[in-house]
């Protein structure tokens, strides 16, 4: 993920947002 310029915090935020979006 470092190659994509994403940090662990960014990855968690994106994963959480994706999960919430899928739930809805």
Curated annotation (Swiss-Prot):
Keywords: Calcium, Cell wall, Heme, Hydrogen peroxide, Iron, Metal-binding, Oxidoreductase, Peroxidase, Secreted
Cofactor: heme b; Ca(2+)
Positions contributing to Ca(2+) binding: 19
Chief localization: secreted
Gene Ontology biological process terms in this record: hydrogen peroxide catabolic process; response to oxidative stress
Compartments, record wording: Secreted; Secreted, Cell wall
Annotated GO MF terms: heme binding; lactoperoxidase activity; metal ion binding
EC number: 1.11.1.7
Taxonomic superkingdom: Eukaryota
Enzyme class: oxidoreductase
UniProt KW Secreted keyword: yes
One Pfam family of this chain: peroxidase
Note on cofactor: Binds 1 heme b (iron(II)-protoporphyrin IX) group per subunit. Binds 2 calcium ions per subunit.
Function per UniProt: Removal of H(2)O(2), oxidation of toxic reductants, biosynthesis and degradation of lignin, suberization, auxin catabolism, response to environmental stresses such as wounding, pathogen attack and oxidative stress. These functions might be dependent on each isozyme/isoform in each plant tissue.
Identification of the protein by name: Peroxidase 7
